[in-house]
Amino acid sequence: MGAVKPPSERVRRKRGKRIQEILTAAAELFGERGYDAVSLEHVAERLDVTKGSLYYYFSSKDELGTAAIETLGDEWTARLEQLLDRTEGTPEARLRALIHEHVTIAVNDYPAALRLFLMPREWPSAQRERIKELRLRHDALFRALIEEGVASGEFTVTSVDTVLQCMHAAMSQAPTWCGELPSAARGKAVDEVADTLLALVHIGQSG
């Protein structure tokens, strides 16, 4: 008998696309309903497939949940890191670009899944700890820019922690505010959110 041939590139791409579809659907459901309220049956219904077909990719809800956390968290933060790598200018210019990109991703790509990271207490302990780690990595991007602006005298804040709490709370609501708007109005709304949040780093400054 001949050796078993490895799967073709086309097969790998198809599998990868299917896994991404499953992870996106699962992340949306976890964000909408909470971890405990979602079953593999719900994910299958969202995708219009059988529950059995999901077991070909994931053996349990815990495995699927972990993969959804890892994929969403890594992809989201990686996109923000890549943005900062190619963005130059003052701390304010870079912070505005970072806020704008974060809100754009939340509104256009992951409107429901964003809540997945806002309520980690609902998750089993292992996934809860991983969510915290991913949030810290994400938070560090904003914190570094705010601290840089404070150190240079460009920003005036009540405290860095308070600014971050207010900023993340507002950004988490952006999908609700902007998501139902038509495309042209949505872009303007995202611009306004970014500009408004910059006021948090100019406390007491005029002009």
Predicted regions and their residues:
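C-terminal peripheral helix-coil segments that are non-catalytic and often amphipathic
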Residues: 1-6, 101-108, 139-151, 168-170, ...
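Hydrophobic/aromatic residues within well-ordered alpha-helical segments
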Residues: 18, 61, 72, 76, ...
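Helix-turn-helix
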Residues: 18-21, 29-63, 67
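Short, hydrophobic secondary-structure boundary micro-motifs
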Residues: 113-118, 158, 179-180
